[in-house]
């Protein structure tokens, strides 16, 4: 039986709280770079009565994201996206943080946007660290908003020599 589908990236507690609140009656497909994380959280959700499929999904890879979405579509129309995936400054170098948190989020939104059902919704959870840094200029905001996804990581402002440390990349 086809159901409405929620896709959920990043098998953590914040994503689970959203999925528990919003995903009852839906097929929930949870993806995480570490399949064991997706499997563990899927078991917790299943024990609470949710229909959950765990998958390995690497947010830094367009191919992996497309595979995740294609698999989810086998269960029905994607009606909801929960993006709670990401890496923190203590977990990875600057390049990885940008590849996952910026590029990966842009790819996920772009690819889901192509297939989400009419009336579908999505939420992306981000960090409060943005409030610790200086505000971006209007020009920087425009570059991040309007640069094609595949060109984002080539922006001069995102080159490692222009990013002070991992906290600033975050």
Residue ranges and their predicted role:
Residues 45-63:
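Rossmann-fold cofactor-recognition segment
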Residues 68, 82, 108-112, 116:
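Hydrophobic positions on the long internal alpha-helix
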Residues 89-91, 114, 118-170:
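Catalytic loop of short-chain dehydrogenase/reductase
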Residues 7-9, 77-86, 120-127:
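Rossmann-fold scaffold of SDR-type NAD(P)-dependent oxidoreductases
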Residues 24-40:
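Conserved glycine-rich Rossmann-like NAD(P)H-binding loop of the short-chain dehydrogenase/reductase
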Residues 1-29:
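Canonical Rossmann dinucleotide-binding motif of NAD(H)/NADP(H)-dependent dehydrogenases/reductases
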Residues 60-76:
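Conserved Rossmann-fold cofactor-binding substructure of NAD(P)-dependent oxidoreductases
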């Amino acid at each position: 039986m086809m159901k409405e589908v929620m896709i959920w990236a990043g098998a953590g507690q914040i994503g689970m709280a959203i999925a528990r609140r919003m995903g009852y009656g839906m097929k929930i497909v949870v993806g995480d770079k570490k399949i064991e994380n997706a499997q563990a959280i899927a078991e917790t959700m299943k024990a609470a009565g949710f229909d959950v499929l765990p998958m390995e999904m690497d947010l830094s890879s367009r191919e992996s994201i497309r595979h995740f979405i294609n698999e989810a579509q086998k269960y029905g129309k994607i009606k909801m996206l929960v993006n709670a995936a990401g890496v923190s400054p203590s977990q990875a170098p600057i390049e990885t943080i940008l590849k996952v948190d910026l590029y990966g989020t842009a790819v996920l939104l772009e690819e889901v946007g192509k297939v989400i059902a009419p009336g579908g919704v999505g939420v992306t959870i981000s960090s409060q660290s943005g409030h610790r840094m200086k505000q971006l200029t209007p020009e920087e905001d425009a570059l991040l908003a309007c640069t094609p996804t595949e060109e984002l990581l080539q922006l001069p402002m995102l080159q490692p020599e222009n990013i002070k440390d991992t906290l600033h990349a975050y």
